[in-house]
Amino acid sequence: MKYQSEIQKRRTFAIISHPDAGKTTLTEKFLLFGGAIQVAGAVKSNKIKKAATSDFMEIERQRGISVATSVMSFEYQGTLVNLLDTPGHKDFAEDTFRTLTAVDSVILVVDSVNGVEEQTRRLMQVCRMRKTPVIVFINKLDRDGKNRFDLLEEIEKELSISLHPMTWPINQGKDFKGVYDLHNKSLRLFTANTKATEDDTISITDLSDAVLDESLGDRDAAQLREDVELIDGVYGELDPESYRAGDVAPVFFGSAVNNFGVKEMLDAFIRIAPPPQDRETSTRHLAVSEEKFSGFIFKIHANLDPKHRDRIAFLRVCSGRFERNKYFHHVRLDKDVRFSNPYTFLAREKSVVDDAYPGDVVGLFDTGNFKIGDTLTEGEEFFFTGIPTFSPEIFKEVVNKDPMKTKQLEKGLLQLTDEGVAQLFTQYGGNKKIIGCVGELQFEVIQYRLLHEYGASVVFNSLPYYKACWLTSNDAKKLEEFVRFKSNNVAEDKDGQLVYLAQSEWFLNTERTNNPDIEFHFTSEVHKS
């Protein structure tokens, strides 16, 4: 019974957004409510008084952009919450996509001023593919933004998801007065810069109550009554199962920087968000209730602490109980491993954990045994499916500026690409090292980290490739011939899989047409190594 109750009390989720929508600020407020931190570090353009807890790498502090997925745990209302913060910047989208494989639900932050943006669309596409339950937080109501009904319509249309308002704002910008909680029938009045846990709530079970007019004024009270009547008529009651199936997204309004509207959402999240769920593996369906341990590595982070050459692998527990000092089976390496100092996280703050349950994320000190997608079990041979590697969009040759540092460069490239920061390719039949990334900022991060963590100085030369496609074929001879004739455009990824580097969409389509026996894949399952 204890095992089942441990599963039910856990919620593991990610916060996702377009850059600057307020994701990191919202993360800080959640940690405040959970008692994990005492002061929130507001992230403002290059004026950071206190570096945000979840932005713990030096390069993040310089840029004010979360570029590494942080893992934070806290307790709230008897529930253990595991929050995975993700890079908002589009150049680090693959890290975010991979993190979505480790969560059971998502909170999507939308800027009320800018509405749906490019990165939001891409992230929601992954959520739809995985049928991940989504809660929407419409942020920055204290600024003049889009009409609330227009914004709901835009989100539904652009993201192909049905919405269900759970709170409703009274005005916005300088006239923003608060939010009405449609579930609890209560009014929360807004005052800028109030204390984080201040609770200025008025219970209003009947909207015709005169206290509404006294609190808001006649005009705004009349508008709220009209809005709520319309919302009730259109949306009715939320069906929690429709939310958990990924069909309906509850919507909350607020201002994260002012800690407003956040508590209502957090309370609802605890109430309706799914606990850890079942998983698919290469051999069978795995029930979360199974008592034998299993889990997978979804992220590797080299060198969290510059003073120590740490390398930490992040493990998502999927079933059973993880125990410190117990031997577990590393499926890919076919060997047993144990961990004497597994950690849980509050960003940089680590604490040793003796056991962990489904939904928990555990940090494991790693000496190079792990790759993303690796599976640990109690002996059973399977791996978890649906952990993808995506085709990069920008390709550059790595040029070593100091031949004396060749070993350091090789080690750095292997470790950084093991983390999933970028993908490493080696030209077929040669030694040319090619880095593939989703965006330019990743190259800056790699260059910075190679120099500061490994002492290797590099420059990157641009290459004229459009996409990388993994090659497979049932006809080994045809594949061998293709590789021989197209060797200038063929490389191997770090796991030895063949990749075709297409110079344009036209070249790719031509090769597909001319080589019907060969399959060109835009994604690769990372477990194939």
Language model features with spans:
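Structural and coupling elements of P-loop NTPases
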Residues: M1-S529
